């Protein structure tokens, strides 16, 4: 038997969320000798910000000014960790319980030289609340590494259950954009990839070399290439290119580290959808685009005793003219 999502009542979800409330969200701040910095909430092991050495005043990540910060509801912006479900699943919080759980800070060490990263590691594991929704045993580890102009994150799912499990996993990057209109941001690297358009509810193949935005976009690209780029035109900042490199793998006893396929989600709610979101400003769609690596087109299977790793590197550089 493979244990996938078990649909329970929403009352269990409410009980989980109600137990997590906090007056103020605790964070850990990473700093690097080159001048970069990043901040991560314990709640959701949620990366809040990433300021690169090339421009310490610039946040690579978008954070909504309307976001909930109550330690109960999910945070809108940064890098939410989506697990074990992508989107809606009966009896589960939207995008899973990982992003609305207080994780444990396992370790934190800032770099003492420019060659090495500053690192924070977080953990969470199955609890009575998660078992009520999903009756399996697991442990999650999330590692955040800060370099001068790179942020590396890795989500590790350890199957400590006696049987195989299945899940979705996604790193929901919100990138800061000066102005998403008029080709102010262009995403590339997905031409020829099959995708599901969640707005039109149709399957299609990407024909564009460059994806620009003029309306609501919510595409799930299956088995996407491992390198994606977002070229962002500066308004009060330099023109810049954000590169996302992603990878998935399974390791453990009897496994030498098998590479797995990963997907990519590209999302912008645009004007009408933005107005319908309580935790998102009406005009904030102009200042973000989400480019999200993960495994969500199908559920990721993980044998007992094995570990699944989803990792990404977000790097930033001035756009070459």
Spans of model-derived segments:
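Fungal secretory targeting signals
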Residues: 1-19, 23
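Beta-strand-rich N-terminal accessory domains
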Residues: 20-78, 232-259, 306-321
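Beta-strand/loop-rich accessory regions of lumenal/periplasmic or secreted enzymes
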Residues: 73-98, 186-203, 296
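Extended, loop-rich substrate-binding clefts of extracytoplasmic carbohydrate-active enzymes
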Residues: 93-148
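Signature of Gram-negative chaperone-usher
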Residues: 101, 105-107, 118-122, 244-292, ...
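Acidic, contiguous internal or C-terminal segments within carbohydrate-active enzymes
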Residues: 126-167, 171, 178
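Active-site/ligand-binding surface loops and adjacent short beta/alpha elements
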Residues: 164-166, 174-263
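Intrinsically disordered, low-complexity Pro/Gly/Ser/Thr-rich segments with frequent PxxP/GP/PP motifs
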Residues: 296-309
């Amino acid at each position: 038997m493979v244990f996938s999502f078990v649909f329970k009542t929403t009352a269990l979800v409410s009980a989980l969320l109600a137990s997590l409330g906090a007056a103020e969200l605790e964070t850990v701040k990473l700093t690097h000798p080159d001048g970069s910095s990043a901040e991560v909430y314990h709640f959701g092991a949620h990366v809040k910000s990433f300021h690169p050495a090339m421009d310490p005043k610039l946040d690579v990540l978008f954070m909504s000014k309307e976001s909930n910060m109550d330690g109960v509801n999910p945070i809108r912006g940064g890098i939410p960790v989506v697990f074990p479900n992508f989107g809606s699943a009966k009896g589960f919080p939207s995008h899973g319980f990982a992003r609305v759980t207080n994780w444990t800070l396992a370790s934190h060490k800032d770099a003492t030289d420019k060659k090495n990263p500053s690192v924070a590691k977080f953990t969470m594991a199955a609890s009575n609340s998660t078992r009520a929704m999903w009756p399996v045993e697991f442990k999650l580890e999330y590692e955040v590494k800060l370099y001068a102009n790179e942020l590396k994150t890795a989500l590790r799912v350890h199957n400590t259950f006696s049987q195989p499990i299945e899940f979705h996993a996604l790193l929901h990057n919100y990138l800061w954009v000066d102005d998403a209109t008029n080709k102010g941001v262009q995403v590339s690297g997905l031409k020829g990839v099959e995708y599901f358009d969640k707005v039109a509810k149709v399957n299609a193949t990407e024909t564009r070399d460059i994806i620009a935005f003029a309306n609501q976009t919510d595409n799930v690209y299956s088995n996407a290439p491992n390198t994606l780029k977002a070229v962002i035109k500066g308004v009060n900042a330099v023109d810049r290119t954000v590169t996302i490199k992603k990878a998935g793998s399974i390791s453990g006893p009897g496994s030498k580290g098998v590479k797995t396929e990963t997907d990519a989600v590209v999302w912008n709610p645009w004007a009408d959808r933005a107005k319908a979101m309580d935790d998102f400003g009406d005009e904030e769609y102009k200042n973000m685009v989400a480019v999200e690596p993960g495994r969500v087109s199908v559920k990721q299977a993980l044998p007992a005793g094995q570990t699944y790793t989803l990792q990404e590197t977000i790097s930033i550089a001035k756009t070459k003219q």
